[in-house]
């Protein structure tokens, strides 16, 4: 599902959600009929007086009071996933609410400010606002999964619990067309995720823009050396912030012979396939080839504040030997300087 939005008269934010082809009913309901709803009530099984019944509980239907839709009320659309775009954040979904947990206060403050900026940028009205709580006005969603325009209102809050910082989005009011209705569990879960993803996307875009600017303004070379992580294990240390180094990876690693396959900035992982560069490359940089067998490897990047740790694991998830990491240090340092010099020459 894709997001787009348009602004209409009256500062009303309208979000357009596009989906697959077919009518809204076809996308929300099961394809077959609902004759099972006409099934008559079960009657008590009558046994002859001299019969000795044997009961097996394996297939007993649990007794109890169960609530939920049936037939056409059952929404078959897959759950809306929350995008993991904030490094270090953990997402918790409970009773349809979405909570982001962060360890550092400055990260939580940035997420909060991102949400405030996103509401302003997208012309979402605010009914009430305090230091830690926001109640929005109606947000209109135009979705191909719905027959009418959908309106929703949210409460957004931030708080602390168990030495962590929480950021929560909760759908509080629901409207279909001009008619207000109770908030269903399905809609609460789905449209909480939609608004959370808008905040996530804005945070990610801001972070990328900031990192790109820092990378452009960085004039001194990146010192790279061997060191150890917080657990004392040997790692490569790049003396530059994580976000700055991340922006340069698509240039650095391919130059060394690594073809990028997967990247996940929030988890700090890059999966790449290695094929040793030719002799000309090693002669040009004046270093011995690294003793690394061709294959798939995963780079693990850790945020150490103004530094970044780098480790490498093989296809089985086993860390490569310390000696191999040491042999990669001068190569990585040379390539970092070389790619930076080429970028500066191009800008001039």
Swiss-Prot record:
Its main location: membrane. PROSITE patterns: PROKAR_LIPOPROTEIN. It comes from the Bacteria. A lipid is attached at residue 20 (N-palmitoyl cysteine). Residues 1-19 form the signal peptide. GO terms for cellular component: cell outer membrane. InterPro entries: BamC (IPR014524), BamC_C (IPR042268), NlpB/DapX (IPR010653). A lipid is attached at residue 20 (S-diacylglycerol cysteine). Keywords: Cell outer membrane, Lipoprotein, Membrane, Palmitate, Signal. It is found in: Cell outer membrane. It holds the Pfam family Lipoprotein_18. The keyword Signal applies. It is a lipid-anchor. The keyword Lipid metabolism does not apply. Belongs to the BamC family. Part of the outer membrane protein assembly complex, which is involved in assembly and insertion of beta-barrel proteins into the outer membrane. Part of the Bam complex. This is Outer membrane protein assembly factor BamC. It comes from Vibrio atlanticus (strain LGP32) (Vibrio splendidus (strain Mel32)).
